[in-house]
């Protein structure tokens, strides 16, 4: 055992000396041993989950929208044996499938554990199991079963873009028939919060209403960031209309009438830019869904991350922090270059789920080789149903990300790109430190 320890210490010293010379174009024979080493290292880092939707399957406030019927990517389907592995690891699940009869065991087991961990204790226990320090709760509203100290809230703001008669928007396709009514519901919730029974009469008061919601959610409800999933509803390219143009549209349609598509887009473009400006003023980072999406009608060409470049590189928003949720997947190779902007960060959730660890390792490695101080970890956990809940989703995202990270670091060290010390520093930054640094109110 002592001989093996000395041998591995020698390998690390050798790798460190190589890193000071020219990097090799391929890893060496030590890569597997290095992988095991970094897998051990990253498993002991308490992570900060930068994007997730924790909650129970019967909770309507887990998200501000719902998924229309459609097919999931191969790895996300219930037939994935890794999900059985998740149930075994978390709950001691004794079966090798999720047949209806076997799934009853899992549902009952979770019910028993919930009784053992009442109130906020259940999900806090889950974070402890996963070795998470904290995990963002990106939800419509916060429930009483999540401890806000462990689950800081990121709240949705898309609904402010949809204040008018949306009948024409809903009729565009089946996805919008699901999405738009939920945005209308969310807007009315914000109005009730601010004690409004109808839209404000003036445009100035509508903007004041938006700002008041942001301030209330930050000061009184613990909100740490705002979130857009606007790519599901419309193209991600935002023009730059004047306030006067937006005000004229509001005045025309606030009391009724159906806007034309160009009118609605111009109004939304102004409101989007107003919201990100307010995010900068209030020090609320702006999270934006930047990847491919679910549903039959998600338009990748119009809603991919590069459509945001004119906004992200606009010097007027240099005081706003942007977090690109899901890292622009499947354009993650291009997306990382947006992080050259000092106020733009990448977040890797979804990627580690739709890609297996071998592919995710390559994507994460490219990020770490480019802007390692601008990339963050997330799981995108979601409670799909009573059997496969947020718990199993958390587990798979956590396992995949840590495995991919360990493999990426092993290859980088073995190829002489970085030292062992730099690899460990990168691991802490990706899993925890970089994301936490964006939210001073959380402390470190």
Predicted segments, located by residue:
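Bacterial N-terminal signal peptides
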Residues: 6-17
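Active-site beta-loop-alpha junctions enriched in small/polar residues
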Residues: 53, 140, 156-162, 229-233, ...
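Histidine/acidic residue-rich metal-binding segments in metalloenzymes
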Residues: 203-228, 235-344, 359-376
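Alpha-helical scaffold segments that flank or form the walls of functional sites
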Residues: 42-43, 61-155, 160-161, 177-192, ...
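H/E-rich (His + Asp/Glu) clusters that bind or coordinate divalent metals
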Residues: 29, 303, 307-308, 312-323, ...
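Mid-to-C-terminal alpha-helical segments outside catalytic/metal-binding sites
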Residues: 22-50, 69-97, 104-114, 372-374, ...
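Histidine-centered catalytic micro-motifs
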Residues: 45-59, 285-293, 324
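A solvent-exposed, charged loop/short amphipathic helix patch at secondary-structure junctions
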Residues: 179-194, 241-262, 402-408
């Amino acid at each position: 055992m002592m001989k093996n320890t000395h041998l591995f210490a020698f390998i690390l010293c050798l790798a460190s000396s190589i890193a000071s010379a020219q990097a090799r174009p391929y890893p060496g024979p030590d890569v597997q041993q290095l992988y095991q080493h970094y897998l051990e290292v990253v498993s002991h880092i308490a992570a900060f989950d930068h994007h997730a939707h924790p909650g129970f399957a019967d909770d309507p406030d887990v998200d501000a929208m719902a998924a229309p019927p459609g097919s999931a990517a191969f790895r996300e389907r219930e037939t994935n044996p890794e999900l059985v592995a998740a149930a075994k690891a978390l709950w001691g699940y004794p079966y090798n499938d999720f047949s209806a009869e076997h799934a009853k065991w899992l549902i009952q087991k979770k019910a028993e554990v919930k009784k053992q961990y009442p109130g906020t204790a259940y999900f806090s226990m889950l974070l402890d199991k996963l070795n998470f320090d904290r995990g963002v709760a990106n939800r419509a509203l916060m429930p009483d079963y999540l401890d806000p100290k462990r689950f800081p809230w990121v709240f949705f703001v898309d609904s402010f873009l949809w204040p008018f008669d949306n009948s024409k928007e809903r009729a565009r396709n089946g996805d919008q028939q699901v999405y738009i009514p939920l945005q209308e519901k969310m807007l009315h919730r914000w109005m009730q919060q601010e004690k409004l029974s109808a839209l404000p009469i003036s445009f100035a008061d509508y903007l004041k209403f938006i700002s008041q919601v942001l301030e209330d959610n930050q000061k009184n409800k613990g909100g740490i960031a705002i979130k857009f999933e606007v790519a599901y509803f419309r193209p991600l390219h935002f023009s730059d209309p004047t306030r006067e143009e937006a005000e004229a549209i509001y005045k025309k349609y606030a009391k009724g009438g159906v806007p034309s598509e160009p009118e609605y887009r111009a109004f939304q473009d102004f409101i989007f830019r107003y919201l990100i400006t307010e995010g900068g003023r209030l020090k609320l980072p702006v999270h934006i869904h930047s990847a491919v999406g679910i549903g039959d009608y998600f338009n990748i060409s119009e809603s991919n991350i590069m459509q945001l470049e004119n906004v992200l590189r606009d010097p007027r928003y240099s005081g706003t922090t942007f977090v690109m949720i899901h890292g622009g997947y499947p354009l993650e190779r291009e997306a990382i270059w947006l992080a050259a902007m000092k106020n733009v960060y990448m977040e890797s959730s979804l990627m580690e789920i739709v890609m297996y660890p071998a592919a995710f390792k390559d994507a994460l490695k490219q990020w770490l080789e480019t802007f390692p101080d601008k990339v963050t970890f997330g799981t995108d956990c979601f409670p799909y149903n009573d059997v496969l809940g947020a718990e199993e989703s958390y587990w798979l995202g956590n396992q995949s990300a840590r495995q991919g990270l360990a493999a990426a670091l092993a290859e980088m060290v073995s190829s002489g790109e970085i030292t062992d010390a730099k690899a460990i520093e990168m691991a802490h930054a990706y899993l925890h430190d970089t994301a936490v640094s964006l939210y001073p109110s959380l402390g470190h």
